[in-house]
């Protein structure tokens, strides 16, 4: 994977919330904004944004994916970074949007320029903002043992597994547990879980059993698709495995939740 050059910390940024965050886990979007604003950024949310087109693309419908992606290209007109709280959606925008419009003399340059400004959340926090969370005023939070789940796209396409690890490991009171099936897919895979439910179900059962064997308090991930899949399966099985988006976890463990309640 080509090593990426990171820009200086900006004053403003866009949020591409993703459709799963918007519909199912809006708290993750709010906490992403809070994390960025606490670092001094003005965060902009273009209201016309929708899906990144990945479901259509991964189902073999590139024309539908092009239609969805084309509607987004002019929404992020300013030269600000586009922050995505999902490695899967960030990977689609950064790596596949330019391919979708490679033969389009108008949309192609736009897609390529936008892709260069797309950052997965943990990548942006660590390498662009270079965050050093101030936890000096955080007291009374119990220690936690967590499992960090990195989605397949985040791990293999965006290469952001180590970014999430670095952020979690920097938090006092947090023990990150590794497990045997850490690098395996959770079975979601977008439309894969719909097309192959039996295989998907077996994969997520393996993931849950392996994570629970560590005795962790919760599973943390930066991808809502994985969280929805693992969380639903764990509840269905009665497995003691709460799930939480990385943005919400970071905000909560660095005092954000306490400040809201004060």
Task: Annotate the PLM regions.
Residues 1-262:
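Iron-sulfur cluster-binding electron-transfer modules in prokaryotic oxidoreductases
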């Amino acid at each position: 994977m080509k090593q990426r050059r990171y820009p200086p910390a900006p004053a403003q940024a866009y949020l591409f919330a993703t459709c799963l965050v918007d519909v199912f886990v809006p708290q993750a979007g709010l906490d992403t904004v809070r994390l960025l604003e606490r670092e001094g950024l003005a965060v902009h949310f273009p209201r016309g944004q929708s899906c990144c087109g990945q479901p259509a693309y991964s189902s073999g419908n590139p024309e539908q994916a092009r239609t969805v992606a084309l509607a987004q290209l002019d929404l992020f007109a300013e030269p600000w970074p586009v922050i995505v709280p999902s490695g899967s959606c960030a990977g689609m925008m950064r790596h596949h949007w330019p391919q979708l419009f490679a033969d389009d003399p108008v949309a192609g340059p736009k897609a390529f320029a936008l892709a260069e400004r797309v950052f997965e959340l943990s990548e942006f926090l660590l390498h662009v903002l270079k965050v050093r969370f101030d936890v000096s005023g955080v007291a009374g939070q119990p220690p936690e043992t967590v499992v960090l789940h990195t989605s397949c796209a985040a791990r293999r396409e965006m290469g952001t597994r180590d970014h999430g690890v670095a952020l979690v490991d920097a938090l006092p009171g947090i023990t990150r547990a590794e497990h045997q099936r850490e690098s395996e897919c959770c079975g979601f895979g977008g439309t894969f879980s719909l097309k192959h439910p039996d295989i998907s179900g077996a994969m997520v059962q393996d993931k849950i059993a392996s994570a629970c064997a560590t005795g962790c308090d919760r599973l943390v991930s930066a991808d809502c698709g994985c969280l929805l899949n693992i969380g639903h399966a764990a509840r269905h099985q009665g497995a003691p495995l709460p799930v939480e988006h990385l943005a919400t976890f970071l905000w909560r463990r660095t005092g954000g939740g306490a400040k809201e309640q004060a």
